[in-house]
Amino acid sequence: MLNIRFEDLVNISNKLISAGYNVRRHCCEYYIGNFEKFICVVAVFPRWKEIRVYTLTKDTLPKDISEILREIAEKYSMKLIIRSIKSRS
């Protein structure tokens, strides 16, 4: 199993907050919003060597969020998967 340092998991939250996002974290899951709506949900799966991002809006994932996640993915040789969840409207 791949071990991700606790500090790196906390650092993801801190970087997103510094970039101006509202972040709620539980273990390896992050709920990211912009104080008006949720933007995405991020799940880190160390065992599978994956970071999965599920976007919750019709817009593309903001570049600063993807850069923060890409940085941690590269550090641990993890695959970054970004998927869109389309609303039923």
PLM features: residue spans?
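Terminal, regulation- and interaction-focused segments at domain boundaries
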Residues: 1-14, 18-19, 88
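C-terminal basic regulatory modules in eukaryotic proteins
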Residues: 10, 46-89
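Short amphipathic alpha-helical surface micro-motifs
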Residues: 12-15, 34-37, 61-64
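Ser/Thr-rich, low-complexity intrinsically disordered terminal regions
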Residues: 17-18, 22-42
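Generic structural signal for short, flexible, solvent-exposed coil/loop and linker residues
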Residues: 10-12, 21, 40, 69
